[in-house]
Every structure is written in structure tokens, then in C-alpha cells.
Amino acid sequence: MKIALIAHDKKKNDMVSFAYAYKPIFEQHELFATGTTGLRIMEATGLVITRYQSGPLGGDQEIGAMIAKNDLDMVIFFRDPLTAQPHEPDVNALLRLCDVYAIPLATNMASAEMLMHALERGDLDYRKLRK
């Protein structure tokens, strides 16, 4: 499956820890990330990640384009709800596309862990049928 990993600045450490904890599962899938998030995960875990631009420079929109083309299966986006983001419209557009195209989306560690366990059990294999 194709999985996108995104994290706002104040959540990047959480994302790196999360990726490290679930590395054995992530290694079985194709990973994509916004620029800095992807770099930090790669440096900490050695995971292979296709990196796009940083979120404020269009990375969220690049991942959104993958969703619109049915070329992404899951999004894990650790958002910082307490800090205003200069690219908030891009973030909202990405979340909207996940809803429009029924892409599993986690926006915090608790929901991300649920998605990872579902992925490990094969509960998300229906995505393969939609291709």
C-alpha cells in the first residue's frame, strides 16, 4: 500500500518516534512524505521514502494530487491544532480530499496506531480492489 506521512513542525518528533515504532510494518509498504518530515524519518529509521516539497511550499498539494488520482491508500498527518499554519487552506484541502476519495486518515497518534494495526491485520486490503 502507498502511505503518506505528514507532520506539522511541533509534531515532527512524534512522527519520527511513531515511524521508528512501526518500522517493521512501514518497511512492507511504499512511503511518501512532505520534505522535512520525510528527511527526519529517513535519517532516524533508514526507511525509504519518496519526499515531496515541504508542506508550506506545496507538499500537501502534491500528496493531495496523489489522492485525486487514486494513487495513495492511507494518510497519517500529525497536525498541531494549537498553532496557526500559514498553509491552512492546503491542509484543509488535503483533509477534504481524503473524505471525498475515502482515504483512511489519522490526524493524531491514537488514530494512527489504530490504522497501523488495521493495516497489519489486512483490514485495509479493500483499497487494493479500488485500483
UniProtKB/Swiss-Prot annotation:
Q: Does the keyword Transport apply?
A: no
Q: What is catalyzed by this enzyme?
A: dihydroxyacetone phosphate = methylglyoxal + phosphate
Out of the domains of life, which is the source? Bacteria
One of the entry's Gene Ontology molecular-function terms is: methylglyoxal synthase activity
Keyword Lyase assigned: yes
Assigned keywords, A-Z: Lyase
Q: Where does substrate bind?
A: H8, K12, T34, G35, T36, T37, S54, G55, H87
Which EC main class describes this enzyme? lyase
Q: Where is the active site?
A: D60 (proton donor/acceptor)
**Which Gene3D superfamilies does this chain map to?**
Methylglyoxal synthase-like domain
Q: Where is the MGS-like domain?
A: 1-131
Q: Which GO terms describe its biological process?
A: methylglyoxal biosynthetic process
Under Enzyme Commission nomenclature, its number is 4.2.3.3
Q: Name one GO cellular component term.
A: cytosol
Q: So what family is this one in?
A: Belongs to the methylglyoxal synthase family.
| Role summary | Catalyzes the formation of methylglyoxal from dihydroxyacetone phosphate.
Q: Per its record, how is this protein called by name?
A: Methylglyoxal synthase
**What species was this sequence derived from?**
Bacillus cereus (strain ATCC 14579 / DSM 31 / CCUG 7414 / JCM 2152 / NBRC 15305 / NCIMB 9373 / NCTC 2599 / NRRL B-3711)
Specify the taxonomic lineage. Answer: Bacteria, Bacillati, Bacillota, Bacilli, Bacillales
Q: Which gene encodes it?
A: mgsA
